[in-house]
């Protein structure tokens, strides 16, 4: 899980979602998981 100021999809499988007001990227590749912090 990467915590960064701007989250962007890295590959075509990445999905940008909102969870409890936080923007997150979820993906099949665990290295692509991101959270806005």
Curated annotation (Swiss-Prot):
InterPro entries: Ribosomal_bL36 (IPR000473), Ribosomal_bL36_sp (IPR035977)
A GO CC term attached to the entry: cytoplasm
Keywords: Ribonucleoprotein, Ribosomal protein
Superkingdom of this protein's organism: Bacteria
GO biological process: translation
Record-level Gene Ontology MF annotations: structural constituent of ribosome
Record flagged with keyword Calcium: no
Signal peptide coordinates: none
Entry keyword Mitochondrion: no
PROSITE patterns: RIBOSOMAL_L36 (PS00828)
Protein family according to the UniProt entry: Belongs to the bacterial ribosomal protein bL36 family.
NCBIfam families found in the cross-reference section: rpmJ_bact
Name this protein carries in UniProt: Large ribosomal subunit protein bL36
Taxonomic source organism: Bacillus cereus (strain ATCC 14579 / DSM 31 / CCUG 7414 / JCM 2152 / NBRC 15305 / NCIMB 9373 / NCTC 2599 / NRRL B-3711)
């Amino acid at each position: 899980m990467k915590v960064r100021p701007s989250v962007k999809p890295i590959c075509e499988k990445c999905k940008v979602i909102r969870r409890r007001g936080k923007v997150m990227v979820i993906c099949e590749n665990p290295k692509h998981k991101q959270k806005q912090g």
